[in-house]
Amino acid sequence: MAVGKNKGLSKGGKKGGKKKVVDPFSRKDWYDVKAPNMFQTRQIGKTLVNRTQGQRIASDYLKGRVFEVSLADLQKDIDPERSFRKFRLIAEDVQDRNVLCNFHGMDLTTDKYRSMVKKWQTLIEAIVEAKTVDGYLLRVFCIGFTAKDQQSQRKTCYAQQSQVRKIRARMTDIITNEVSGADLKQLVNKLALDSIAKDIEKSCQRIYPLHDVYIRKVKVLKKPRFDVSKLLELHGDGGGKSVEAVVSSEGAVIDRPEGYEPPVQEAV
């Protein structure tokens, strides 16, 4: 057994010393998330990212982020028919402190989807892949349920398999025509208004009455080559950049974009 004192413990040692606490948020910047001009609400929130340091560029870490927003928040509408639709927006480019997003998909909330599934009715679903005019390949999921006849005394309202096949074929034809005959902006407007589902419900009345017909989900499978000019055109004003007026030393008013930082002077 060694006899002696432990000098590391008596002096406190390196492990016992106080460490300098650095706030992690001091190395981060806030960026405004901008939605396309097809929605009424342009700024949907803010996002954090580490500040540019060396080869680690902040914009590279922002591109590809996906934001999920309710349609009611995007359209500034309290209608309950809009609150259960969720739109997914993906960050494609960064201009100054603005993150410009594009459509990346749509989905229904889980509680809405599960509340529609009930007994004594037939669930009919169609999955369609179609390409828009501007080259976006989409997979569209449509769902509908058979409706009970008010004059019928039966408890159930099941459809025959031949009727189910006809309704599914009608769903496929309508979705294919609507998607292939419009660009992405026009299609998003149709999804927001739910016009495709209403056309399907109206067209299938002769085969079998339906209710709760919705475009349940939309996935973006393939996109065309990225073009900055098309994204800026989709945002209209380039992402809603705000310009602040700065008065120079000579008294002239200078317009500078938001987030402007003066260059570093090498010599005084």
Swiss-Prot record:
Biological process, per Gene Ontology: cytoplasmic translation; oogenesis
Keywords: Cytoplasm, Developmental protein, Differentiation, Oogenesis, Ribonucleoprotein, Ribosomal protein
SMART domains noted in UniProt: Ribosomal_S3Ae
Region Disordered: start-end pairs: 1-21
Descriptive protein name: Small ribosomal subunit protein eS1
GO MF term set: structural constituent of ribosome
Coiled coil (UniProt feature): none
Primary localization class, coarse: cytoplasm
Organism encoding this protein: Drosophila melanogaster
Quaternary organization: Component of the small ribosomal subunit. Mature ribosomes consist of a small (40S) and a large (60S) subunit. The 40S subunit contains about 33 different proteins and 1 molecule of RNA (18S). The 60S subunit contains about 49 different proteins and 3 molecules of RNA (28S, 5.8S and 5S).
PROSITE patterns hit by this protein: RIBOSOMAL_S3AE
GO cellular component: cytosol; cytosolic ribosome; cytosolic small ribosomal subunit
Tissue: Ubiquitously expressed in stage 8 embryos. During oogenesis, expression is located basally in somatic follicular epithelium and in the oocyte at the later stages.
InterPro entries noted in UniProt: Ribosomal_eS1, Ribosomal_eS1_CS, Ribosomal_eS1_euk
Keyword field contains Cytoplasm: yes
Gene ablation phenotype (knockout): Flies exhibit disappearance of the follicular cells of the ovary and abnormalities of the associated germline derivatives, leading to failure of egg production.
Protein family membership: Belongs to the eukaryotic ribosomal protein eS1 family.
